[in-house]
Amino acid sequence: MGQVLPLVTRQGDRIAIVSGLRTPFARQATAFHGIPAVDLGKMVVGELLARSEIPAEVIEQLVFGQVVQMPEAPNIAREIVLGTGMNVHTDAYSVSRACATSFQAIANVAESLMAGTIRAGIAGGADSSSVLPIGVSKKLARVLVDVNKARTMSQRLKLFSRLRLRDLMPVPPAVAEYSTGLRMGDTAEQMAKTYGITREQQDALAHRSHQRAAQAWSDGKLKEEVMTAFIPPYKQPLVEDNNIRGNSSLADYAKLRPAFDRKHGTVTAANSTPLTDGAAAVILMTESRAKELGLVPLGYLRSYAFTAIDVWQDMLLGPAWSTPLALERAGLTMSDLTLIDMHEAFAAQTLANIQLLGSERFARDVLGRAHATGEVDESKFNVLGGSIAYGHPFAATGARMITQTLHELRRRGGGFGLVTACAAGGLGAAMVVEAE
């Protein structure tokens, strides 16, 4: 085993995760239609502070993420500080690491705590797939810049005469990788073919995710960590996630056609996570600061790791790469874990990562390790369902997973939890958390 890297301050304090909260997650263009990510972020941070009863001046830093950014609010973190009644002097900056964005926000606050520059901070993320930065064509954009510099009406008219009707069409945000042009679903199809993952296996995992998420809500396990969202026109609040299919049968999944490879594919809308709106945040402190304030932490951050691989083939293998590093830095093995929570971008991606975590060949030939990371125990894996059921507001998912895992660990009497995700650009993230 490699070097253990304890996450402690210079005084020996552990990094405490005091509390966490999220909005309900809503499918694109449903309950949060027209609500920008910055407002979702304000909503969750404001409620998190109100519930914690922590004085606003205690929070010294806010690191927040947004993947689909809006030009009018490029620093969502600072807008949240200014819009929630927090101390105006609170340091705030924004981060983006695609689907692992709130992992990055949490790591950044943890690093500030370990460096001793702060003693308490908030980390999280928000995204809206319903309020999007709809752009213009490159040709129209160039003409508009030139028109702004033109001095006479004739010069302006000459510039506009270069445009064709197609140049005036709005341009939605790209859904493909900038470097390769591949959509996420194309990569999921690659992975299904590379690792021999069948349509039936993907549908079964998706069905499992929805069943377990529906059961978690039915059992009241998510009430403490999900706020009620009051949104314009304030006629009906959103209390629960609205993507979960609690009454579906496995046979229903087989009815859908492939969404990406129409002829030979196995990835469908039902075995993929949907476009989603929502926000999530956590409060982190040094262990001693939490004690001073009389707070009992949800748990502690034990380790984290980020990785990157090539984007052309099977790029959503982040968990298989980052998990062994995070476990190594925590001084743990897979068998030491009480819970494993993996982001389900696609059922194919999830199953591929599970397969590789237990692969001796992958460990030896690709990772350069002597042994496989370890088989994933199904009884520990995504026990409350995953992103296929809950949805995936890109920047919020990591904070959701960490809060959810810590609450479940406490219900089970404590232990260690692994939280891990793939991300666009071939990125991966993993964190080990501990509850007592």
Swiss-Prot record:
**So what does this thing catalyse?**
an acyl-CoA + acetyl-CoA = a 3-oxoacyl-CoA + CoA
Please give the biological process terms from Gene Ontology that the record holds. Answer: fatty acid beta-oxidation
Q: In its keyword annotation, does this UniProt entry include Acyltransferase?
A: yes
Q: Which domain of life is it from?
A: Bacteria
Localization per record? Cytoplasm
- Give GO cellular component annotations, separated by semicolons: cytosol
Sample GO molecular function, one term: acetyl-CoA C-acyltransferase activity
Write the record's keywords in alphabetical order, separated by commas.
Answer: Acyltransferase, Cytoplasm, Fatty acid metabolism, Lipid degradation, Lipid metabolism, Transferase
EC numbers listed for it are 2.3.1.16
InterPro entries, A to Z: Ac-CoA_C-AcTrfase_FadI (IPR012806), Thiolase (IPR002155), Thiolase-like (IPR016039), Thiolase_acyl_enz_int_AS (IPR020615), Thiolase_AS (IPR020610), Thiolase_C (IPR020617), Thiolase_CS (IPR020613), Thiolase_N (IPR020616)
* Primary localization: cytoplasm
The pathway it acts in is:
Lipid metabolism; fatty acid beta-oxidation
Supply the Pfam families for this chain: Thiolase_C, Thiolase_N
Report the active site residues: C99, H392, C422
Query: What family is reported?
Result: Belongs to the thiolase-like superfamily. Thiolase family.
Cite the record's note on assembly: Heterotetramer of two alpha chains (FadJ) and two beta chains (FadI).
What this chain does, per the entry, is described as:
Catalyzes the final step of fatty acid oxidation in which acetyl-CoA is released and the CoA ester of a fatty acid two carbons shorter is formed.
HAMAP family documented for this protein: FadI
Which NCBIfam families does the protein's record reference?
AcCoA-C-Actrans, FadI, PRK08963.1
Protein name, per record: 3-ketoacyl-CoA thiolase
Organism source for this protein? Escherichia coli O7:K1 (strain IAI39 / ExPEC)
- Its gene is fadI
